[in-house]
């Protein structure tokens, strides 16, 4: 499907973690980080774009305050600075930012986009969403 030029959605929540035990599979208690798993898969495929969908159209700093500001295009270094300054909530935007940074670190020619499901198509052409790129990449 990838070789045919299709957009492949291949990582998400809802799976049941299993281990092999005595030649059979056994369910175990574990958390599957869908942001991290999709970033690892995209990097292993050397994907051009990692698209992460969420409830908002952009990543924001100072989220839910009067100073809230949408980030449209930022370097991985800027994203890391905002991350380390505490701008992204654990269990919400933080794992998405971490996944994007991991993807770019493993695939420096690729870039990541975070946006809402409704804006996914437009985000792929760069007209909406937050684009996170390697500072050496030309977008």
Q: Model-found features: residue ranges?
A:
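C-terminal catalytic "cap/lid" subdomain
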Residues: 1-139
């Amino acid at each position: 499907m990838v070789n045919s030029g299709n957009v492949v959605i291949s990582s998400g929540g809802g799976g049941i973690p299993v281990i092999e035990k005595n030649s059979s599979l056994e369910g175990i208690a574990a958390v599957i980080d869908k942001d991290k798993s999709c970033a690892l898969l995209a990097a292993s495929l050397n994907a051009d774009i990692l698209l992460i969908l969420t409830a908002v159209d952009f990543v924001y700093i100072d989220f839910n305050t009067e100073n809230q500001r949408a980030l449209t295009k930022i370097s991985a270094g800027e994203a890391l600075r905002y991350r380390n300054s505490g701008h992204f909530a654990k269990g919400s935007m933080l794992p998405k930012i971490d996944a994007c940074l991991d993807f770019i670190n493993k695939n420096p020619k690729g870039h990541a986009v975070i946006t809402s499901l409704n804006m996914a198509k437009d985000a792929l052409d760069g007209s909406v969403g937050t684009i996170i790129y390697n500072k050496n990449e030309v977008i």
